[in-house]
UniProtKB/Swiss-Prot annotation:
GO biological processes: arginine biosynthetic process via ornithine; L-arginine biosynthetic process
UniProt-recorded name of the protein: Acetylglutamate kinase
Pathway(s) served: Amino-acid biosynthesis; L-arginine biosynthesis; N(2)-acetyl-L-ornithine from L-glutamate: step 2/4
Provenance organism: Aquifex aeolicus (strain VF5)
UniProt-listed PANTHER family: N-ACETYLGLUTAMATE SYNTHASE (PTHR23342), N-ACETYLGLUTAMATE SYNTHASE, MITOCHONDRIAL (PTHR23342:SF0)
Recorded name of the encoding gene: argB
């Protein structure tokens, strides 16, 4: 009986959050261990379906770096990185698109649909479908300068940045009870494909559709302080300060930068959470304590 009472308390705790976020859009960047561990995959899918059934509209953007590297090696192509970004020549771009749009995307769609029932369906999209993600070649000078990193001289190939999002397509799908699952492959003016960083894609999509929340699933607890302890709440100014001090460093810098960009474009809150924790999305969104770092403008 006590266990049942505790479960009831959990539902009661979630109620005000369900009421507050009903009808709102959450963009979720899906990556890391949550994509590979079977229990975490199932936990993620169930969480996404639950969000939809309680009236929240999830939009999923996924990565796939490790799978791309493995597939390139199978084809005898050695993965190359320039300044931490995958050098994407034409041959590599074909593999990137094949893995992201054809393999990973459809696997995630099937996973969510396993739990979604008869009224809700996940649908897979590439950024090239319906010109969902219009892109151009990444301005590497601006990108690396903003991160405080030296600008590499080597050409990065078909690495892109998003210049426009087909909001109408996303909202049409959401209004018809679909859960969009988006592969971060952009389309250029001439129809060429671009490899877009999934964090940046999620940030741009969230900003353009003015999402209530942008949630990053990661393989870390969140943003950590000087002692390695989790920072539960972070403002834009504090984030900038921690970047300058070197507390926020390495791979967390571009993630936080993309979070700040989303906030500046109208997203209410960004959450960087530990995707290694089962049901981390629900714990972050529907409990007072949360399980990651919440980032806001002020």
């Amino acid at each position: 009986m006590n266990e049942l009472i505790e479960k009831a308390k959990v539902l009661q705790e979630a109620l005000p959050y369900i009421r507050e976020f009903h009808g709102k859009v959450f963009v979720i960047k899906y990556g890391g261990s949550a994509m590979h561990d079977e229990e975490l995959r199932e936990s993620f899918a169930r969480d996404v379906v639950l969000l939809k059934y309680v009236g929240i509209n999830p939009v999923i953007v996924h990565g796939g770096g490790p799978q791309i590297s493995k597939t390139l090696e199978k084809f005898g192509i050695k993965p190359k990185f320039v300044g931490g970004m995958r050098k994407t020549d034409e041959e590599t771009m074909h593999v990137v698109e094949m893995v992201l749009s054809g393999d990973i995307n459809k696997d995630i769609v099937a996973l969510i649909n396993r739990y979604s029932g008869e009224k809700i369906y996940a649908v897979g999209l590439s950024g090239r479908d319906g010109r969902l993600l219009k892109a151009k070649k990444l301005d590497k000078e601006r990108y690396f300068s903003e991160l405080g990193l030296p600008v590499p001289e080597e050409d990065i190939g078909f690495v892109g940045e998003i210049v426009d999002v087909n909001e109408e397509l996303i909202f049409t799908l959401l209004s018809h009870n679909f859960i969009p699952v988006i592969a971060p492959v952009g389309v250029g003016e001439e129809g060429e494909a671009y490899n877009v960083n999934a964090d940046l894609a999620a940030s741009e999509i969230a900003g353009e559709i003015k999402a209530e929340k942008l949630i990053y699933l990661t393989d870390t607890k969140g943003v950590l302080d000087e002692k390695g302890e989790l920072i539960s709440s972070l403002s834009k100014d504090k984030a900038e300060e921690l970047i300058k001090k070197g507390v926020i460093r390495e791979g967390m810098i571009p993630k936080v930068r993309s979070a700040l960009r989303a906030l500046e474009k109208g997203v209410k809150k960004v959450h960087i959470i530990d995707g290694r924790v089962k049901h981390s999305i629900l714990l972050e969104v529907f409990t007072k304590e949360g399980v990651g770092t919440e980032i806001t403008l002020e």
